[in-house]
Amino acid sequence: MFDIGFLELAVIAVIGLIVIGPERLPEAVRSGATWMAKIRKMMRDTRAEIEVQIGADEIRRELHNEQVMKSLEALKVTKDDIQQHILDADRKMMLEQEAEEAKLQTPVSRRVAGDDPTLGTDDNVFTDPSYAHPPEEPSKVEADTSAETPQANNQDQQPTTKTEPANDR
């Protein structure tokens, strides 16, 4: 409140000692201190009364609350942005995973077929009547011929030409 340094206090003490005298100086200091305490108390009470009348505490609280609410709003916006980024990344990852699963679930013949939609499809399984009945059993003759050795089968498939060895005698 008062900005009094050591030098100013020394000057006031010397003037008080000269004016009041050494006998009454301690009593004057005590009465001055009590008057200062009463003035401070009166100023403190007046300030508190003015603050109550104006509502300074409420204004401070409201200002503080407004600042807190603004920072909360900024945090909510940041939180929403982060959640949106997380959801977008999660959706992207789910789509990639579903695409990978779909790729793994497609038959090999379809993947080999490429762009030709007719290759590798089994759509005619239900419409073609030849699929409705199992193939006929081979007759006994066919079964007996198929049981022959593979060498005999190879001879049937390839024409044989017999070459006679040349006699050198």
From Swiss-Prot:
Bilayer-crossing regions: 1-21
Membrane topology type: Single-pass membrane protein
UniProt record, GO biological process: protein transport by the Tat complex
GO molecular function (one): protein transmembrane transporter activity
Composition bias type Polar residues, residue spans: 146-169
Positions of region (Disordered): 98-169
GO cellular component terms attached to this protein's record: TAT protein transport complex
Subunit structure, interactors included: The Tat system comprises two distinct complexes: a TatABC complex, containing multiple copies of TatA, TatB and TatC subunits, and a separate TatA complex, containing only TatA subunits. Substrates initially bind to the TatABC complex, which probably triggers association of the separate TatA complex to form the active translocon.
UniProt similarity note: Belongs to the TatB family.
NCBIfam families, sorted: tatB
Protein name: Sec-independent protein translocase protein TatB
